[in-house]
Amino acid sequence: MSELTTIARPYAKAAFDFAVEQSATDKSAVEKWTEMLGFAAQVADNEQIRDFFANTFSVQKAADAMVSICGEQLDQYGQNLIRLMAENKRLTVLPAVFDEFQRYVEEHNATAEVQVISAQPLNATQEQKIAAAMEKRLARKVKLNCSVDNSLLAGVIIRTDDFVIDGSSRGQLNRLANELQ
């Protein structure tokens, strides 16, 4: 996966920098680019489309097909990015480009995505407390993605891109079992 990230990063950075530059005149430019790249990434991630890219020897055909499928979803600059990526035989990394682009947007907006897995559904107060604690620790706004996993027994697991906090009973029991061995 790190190879894909390495390949995708320059495309994502260029698209992000261009979107930020455009946002001086169009406040929704970053959101538009997020939508364009998200749609193109979904198309490129389709199994039939990936097979087509793998078996197409013409760069022009691959680019034209992708632009045609995406249609009105891409503006002229989005189409230029698709054509450049096709020319470099990188259309298959569009999903990774989208992921990297989203990371740049999160950094730019000073937000972080935090996954919270709990044994029981969290109420609004608990979510607010976790969000406040994570905002303080990360020094940025957080977006919580909460889910329930009954196998935790009790407690929560909090995950970000940088670290994991395992405050679950299952995690504590596993650590205790490892210490006793």
Curated annotation (Swiss-Prot):
Q: Which UniProt keywords apply?
A: ATP synthesis, Cell inner membrane, Cell membrane, CF(1), Hydrogen ion transport, Ion transport, Membrane, Transport
Q: Which InterPro entries match?
A: ATP_synth_OSCP/delta_N_sf (IPR026015), ATPase_OSCP/dsu (IPR000711)
- The protein's predominant localisation is membrane
Q: Which GO terms describe its molecular function?
A: proton-transporting ATP synthase activity, rotational mechanism
How is the protein disposed in the membrane?
Peripheral membrane protein
- At the top level, the lineage of the source is Bacteria
State whether keyword GTP-binding applies: no
Alphabetical GO CC annotations of the entry are: plasma membrane; proton-transporting ATP synthase complex
Could you describe the subunit structure of this protein?
F-type ATPases have 2 components, F(1) - the catalytic core - and F(0) - the membrane proton channel. F(1) has five subunits: alpha(3), beta(3), gamma(1), delta(1), epsilon(1). F(0) has three main subunits: a(1), b(2) and c(10-14). The alpha and beta chains form an alternating ring which encloses part of the gamma chain. F(1) is attached to F(0) by a central stalk formed by the gamma and epsilon chains, while a peripheral stalk is formed by the delta and b chains.
Q: What does this protein do?
A: F(1)F(0) ATP synthase produces ATP from ADP in the presence of a proton or sodium gradient. F-type ATPases consist of two structural domains, F(1) containing the extramembraneous catalytic core and F(0) containing the membrane proton channel, linked together by a central stalk and a peripheral stalk. During catalysis, ATP synthesis in the catalytic domain of F(1) is coupled via a rotary mechanism of the central stalk subunits to proton translocation. This protein is part of the stalk that links CF(0) to CF(1). It either transmits conformational changes from CF(0) to CF(1) or is implicated in proton conduction.
Name of the protein this chain belongs to: ATP synthase subunit delta
Family the entry assigns:
Belongs to the ATPase delta chain family.
Q: Which compartment or compartments is the protein found in? A: Cell inner membrane
Q: Which SUPFAM superfamilies match?
A: N-terminal domain of the delta subunit of the F1F0-ATP synthase
Species assigned in the record: Mannheimia succiniciproducens (strain KCTC 0769BP / MBEL55E)
Please name the Pfam families in this protein's record: OSCP
